[in-house]
Amino acid sequence: MTSGPSQPFPSASGPDDGPSWPRILGRLTTGQNLPNGHAAWAMDQIMTGAATPAQISGFAVSMKMKRPTASEVRELADIMLTHARRVPTDEIGTDTVDIVGTGGDGANTVNLSTMASIVVAACGVPVVKHGNRAASSLSGGADTLEALGVRIDLGPDDVARSVREVGIGFAFAPQFHPSYKHASIVRREIGVPTVFNLLGPLTNPAGPRAGLIGCAWADLAEVMAGVFAARGSSVLVVHGDDGLDELTTTTTSTIWRVQGGTMERLTFDPAAFGFKRAEISELVGGDASENAAEARAVLGGAKGPVRDAVVLNAAGAMVAHAGLASDAQWLPAWEAGLARAVEAIDSGAAEQLLARWVRFGQQL
């Protein structure tokens, strides 16, 4: 297949070495990394509608099986962002935080990152949550927020205004990545995790510089951390050692701490902070209305394993946000984050913030 006239990635090495689908898929299916620029070329073909569904699915699956490099994934994410609608940051800035995971862990837990986002915002840390409807679980973050009464369909200006006025905004992926529709159809049809699972957390249209980013695959968590390190972000990329794309309370988690362009791998045990071990069954959710009811209960002060996991993940996001300052210290940041998260729930601040967020959407 020839590249279209809009193709902005010509090869400097002549036509024989330039990117093409047979060349790219040939390399990926034999386990070879792509030359610089080839992943970007492929993603541009996908985003402009020039790639066929067969080419998209072949690329998505073979790239995941080959195990993408950080530079390949960064090319994919950067091209996706060039095609995106962006949230204006002239007033809200980029010292914001996102709490989001790749999905694909198969555990169907309650929406921990969604609840944690509300708690973090109630602590005064500005949040821009990037999310979507469920792909493999019963209820994604967008589904649960909608069931809570939050408007999920806001455009760029209103998301920025939501962050400014409420302290949190939700960027619904289909609103901001319309060109991604070609890939999302294929992704739904093939129904297995692909390299595209990594891109959601890497393509927040508000460009937050901090994040608690969950990855369901331990080997790919390190790849994601490499992309964030290249961007100079302050991020904790986390993988529950039980397979969750969250900081888990059932066992330890592996954390890739990204700060100042460097990456450090750590084993994190919540028991060190006094958390009881949970069973995975205690964190399992249901449909959107059931998960919304659970969120209301937790934000209303209900104790138990779900609250523990929400507090832990909210604290992790605040640790990442604290890392934007070069003098941030690991243990004091955790202690402060955990105390702030508990206070935000127990004082009623988190519940009140959700009510303000719902009201904001109703008044638009």
Curated annotation (Swiss-Prot):
Known cofactor(s): Mg(2+)
Disordered: annotated span: 1-22
EC number: 2.4.2.18
GO cellular component, one term: cytosol
Keywords: Amino-acid biosynthesis, Aromatic amino acid biosynthesis, Glycosyltransferase, Magnesium, Metal-binding, Transferase, Tryptophan biosynthesis
Entry binding sites for anthranilate 2: 187
Polar residues: compositionally biased ranges: 1-10
Catalytic activity annotation: N-(5-phospho-beta-D-ribosyl)anthranilate + diphosphate = 5-phospho-alpha-D-ribose 1-diphosphate + anthranilate
Pfam families named in the record: Glycos_trans_3N, Glycos_transf_3
Binding positions (anthranilate 1): 101, 132
GO biological process assignments: L-tryptophan biosynthetic process
Known partners and oligomeric status: Homodimer.
Protein's recorded name: Anthranilate phosphoribosyltransferase
